[in-house]
Swiss-Prot record:
Pfam family, any one: IL13
Disulfide-bond pairs as recorded: 48-76, 64-90
Name listed for the protein in its UniProt record: Interleukin-13
Glycosylated position list: 38, 49, 57, 72, 75, 131
Originating species: Camelus bactrianus
Taxonomic lineage of the native organism: Eukaryota, Metazoa, Chordata, Craniata, Vertebrata
Length: 136
């Protein structure tokens, strides 16, 4: 009996480690894309006074990395809604000391960052939409 219980607990733990990272709903991802499109569409002046943010690797923890990169941008009402959306999409809570998964070696303008995030979000949405439709 004890051996059986140990096996069940072991499989439960391994299953938890192997389970995929929670993914946002298609609706949440679509709303983020719409917001990013709104930001980039009618932009004439430099976004957020030309503020610079750390470039990130969007292939891992995209929403958390994007949130972390934009966290220090203040007094820029244009991206506040995006920051809130990224905060909701990231399953990890911000700690007092933010530690990054990416190497902080390249800074880019917020405008370029938002455009890159938009393109990557669209790719993720289309890829997931294709896979969701195949499962149906």
């Amino acid at each position: 009996m004890a051996l059986w219980l140990t096996v069940v607990i072991a499989f439960t733990c391994i299953g938890g480690l192997a389970s995929p990272v929670p993914t946002p709903s298609p609706k949440a991802l679509k709303e983020l894309i719409e917001e990013l499109v709104n930001i980039t569409q009618n932009q004439k002046a430099p976004l957020c006074n030309g503020s610079m943010v750390w470039s990130i690797n969007l292939t891992t923890s995209m929403y958390c990395a994007a949130r972390e990169s934009l966290i220090n941008i203040t007094n820029c009402s244009v991206i506040q809604r995006t920051q809130r959306m990224l905060n909701a999409l990231c399953p990890h809570k911000l700690s007092a000391k933010v530690s990054s998964e990416h190497v902080r070696d390249t800074k880019i303008e917020v405008t370029q960052f938002i455009k890159t995030l938009l393109q990557h979000s669209r790719n993720v949405f289309h890829y997931r939409s294709f896979n969701w439709s195949k499962k149906s």
